[in-house]
Amino acid sequence: MDFNGREKNEGINFFQKYLTIWVFICMVVGVIIGKLLPAIPNALGNLEISGISIPIAILIWIMIYPMMLKVDFQSIKQVGRNPKGLFITWITNWLIKPFTMYGIASLFLFTVFKGCIAPELATQYLAGAVLLGAAPCTAMVFVWSTLTKGNPAYTVVQVATNDLIILIPFVPIVKFLLGVSNVSVPYGTLFFSVILFVVIPLVGGVLTRIVVVKNKGIGYFENTFVHKFDNATTVGLLLTLVLIFASQTEVILSNPLHIVLIAVPLTVQTVLIFFIAYAASKIFGMSHNIAAPAGMIGASNFFELAVAVVIALFGTTSQAALATTVGVLTEVPVMLVLVKVANSTKGWFKS
């Protein structure tokens, strides 16, 4: 049931289940375009305002706006009902996750794989990893929560609060970690990208919800209106990835092994963060239907935002952009494994 007690039977859909395959297809299509028709990504790359690619901005709004529609910020009123689970989520997402991502990615990219990745490339890949680690997941959390039989009302609160919290610490955390990595980031561009790709879609989603619910009712909004946008996020993401891979053709063809190497620290990070939040929930006596979503929301990433910001900061041709797309490539299969782990350990938690 949802936060109002209505039953929902939403699981992972066709696009979500095979997202890794779609990303591979996007990679192939993008590389073919970049190799045979390089004028296309070059022309699209020139359509920009203040360093922001107009085609990419449109695609990212198509990705993020439907996600914001699904979040009911009225649920924040329920924060005080069971705050321990929320504190676990917040601490994991904002005080642990960004810094473990930085540490793990640095270890692998600069030490373990130093014989395979040049330092200047490793720095760019690290920047992409940092952007992935600094933003907890939004839309896909509802899928993971459903697959682990999580408490839907509590999951909504977890997502809603994180979507609001992201407005404050995301910019300084990214600025700090990229600064430590010796990556120069214009503070204004970083702040503007959050306004453009988080605040505007968030406000648009909230206003749309208010208007539609007022005129058509909550039932129509949740059962009909929202589902009109079901595939918009996926289509927007896949088209964005095609453009990125088209711009990354030479890097991919000259360093195909790098995609595998980048995937290693991202996978380690995902598993580690899941178990940190999951174990903390166990220690503090949370029920499984709160513990599982708590682990999932930290383990998965708001990769749509990461892709948006990395393009705004470094462009589609940067190696940092390639690192964020590898995050998209690896997330679904890893998260499906963690879903199985969560479901098989349900007996560890109180009912």
Description of each model-found segment:
Residues 1-69, 74-299, 303-351:
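Alpha-helical transmembrane segments of multi-pass small-molecule/ion transporters
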